[in-house]
Curated annotation (Swiss-Prot):
Residues 97-117 are annotated as: Involved in binding TNC and actin. This is Troponin I, fast skeletal muscle. GO terms for biological process: cardiac muscle contraction; positive regulation of DNA-templated transcription; relaxation of skeletal muscle; skeletal muscle contraction. PANTHER family: TROPONIN I, TROPONIN I, FAST SKELETAL MUSCLE. The modification N-acetylglycine is found at residue 2. The modification Phosphoserine is found at residue 118. Residues 2-48 are annotated as: Involved in binding TNC. The keyword Transmembrane does not apply. Belongs to the troponin I family. GO terms for molecular function: actin binding; troponin T binding.
Amino acid sequence: MGDEEKRNRAITARRQHLKSVMLQIAATELEKEESRRESEKQNYLSEHCPPLHIPGSMSEVQELCKQLHAKIDAAEEEKYDMEVKVQKSSKELEDMNQKLFDLRGKFKRPPLRRVRMSADAMLKALLGSKHKVCMDLRANLKQVKKEDTEKERDLRDVGDWRKNIEEKSGMEGRKKMFESES
């Protein structure tokens, strides 16, 4: 067991030593990478950004500001032109895709949701905002009076329940019921 413990300790010590060496190598690589990035950044800035020369007089500073503003305006115009081109090309792509689907006969159907919409809103959506159409669907409906059913009339006519019982009691009350039914 003594040899085995020494061996395990040697293995763990060797592992720790290898880990520390690997960490040192990684740290030096990171430092080299950082210095390389910094030098690339300096090279890029020196190539693309001319050194700033600030003149001494006020008129020269104003002239420099005007030049810088002109450059900014030109860059903004280019940016706007590029955005317009991108929008135009994306629109053309969408149109071409739609034509492609039409030619193939396969339509890409978007998922539709059920929307509650009044008739006026539907007409406005179909015809556009230029046409003002008010459609009252209830105006053309026929008005119907509710006819009283016999049961409702009986209930209204009954009034006091005692009178109802007296009328229906005996043979004459039964006779009246049969006469009214036929």
